[in-house]
């Protein structure tokens, strides 16, 4: 089953074309790596797929929902806000610099979105967050703050935070986890 389909995606920043006619398909269960030198558009592609950047042209379908429904003069025409929200909930992303909330504990960083976005009860969100912390080997750090963690620990908290929203299809990462690089 196709979970992500990108057809002829292009992205321009004024006159600079960063992505040109990118097409790909990702099936359920597949792991895909986007590899290239600095400045080649990897992050821009991920940002476009996660709706952080406006696509100039092309078509994107995630879990059967079309993100792009037409083409305007200088940019793609997006689906309704309701469809885009549904799509966004299906995609998990760990940012390159992790983007943890510095004023929140590890546990609060992980539970904030499930409580606010998914409307989960606080106790359920905390229980699930603790299970995720155990999976990433940080069960003893739930009361710590991001500044008290190493870079690798911050990355694992960020992974747990993305997984806490139960993305259905795939997990976009801008860099491989630090623990896989040795």
Q: Where are the language model's segments positioned?
A:
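ABC family nucleotide-binding domain
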Residues: 2-182
């Amino acid at each position: 089953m196709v979970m992500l389909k990108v057809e002829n995606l292009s992205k321009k920043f004024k006159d600079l074309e960063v992505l040109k006619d990118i097409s790909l398909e990702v099936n359920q269960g597949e792991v895909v790596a986007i590899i290239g030198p600095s400045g080649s558009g990897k992050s821009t592609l991920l940002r476009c797929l996660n709706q952080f950047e406006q696509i100039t042209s092309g078509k994107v379908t995630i879990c059967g929902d079309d993100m792009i429904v037409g083409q305007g003069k200088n940019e793609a025409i997006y689906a309704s806000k309701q469809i885009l929200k549904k799509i966004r909930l299906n995609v998990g992303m760990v940012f390159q610099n992790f983007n943890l909330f510095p004023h929140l504990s590890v546990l609060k960083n992980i539970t904030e979105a499930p409580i606010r976005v998914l409307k989960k009860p606080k106790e359920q969100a905390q229980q699930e967050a603790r299970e995720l912390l155990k999976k990433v080997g940080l069960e003893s750090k739930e009361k710590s703050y991001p500044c008290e963690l190493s870079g690798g620990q911050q990355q694992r908290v960020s992974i747990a935070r993305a997984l806490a929203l139960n993305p259905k299809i795939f997990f976009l990462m801008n860099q491989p986890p630090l623990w896989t690089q040795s």
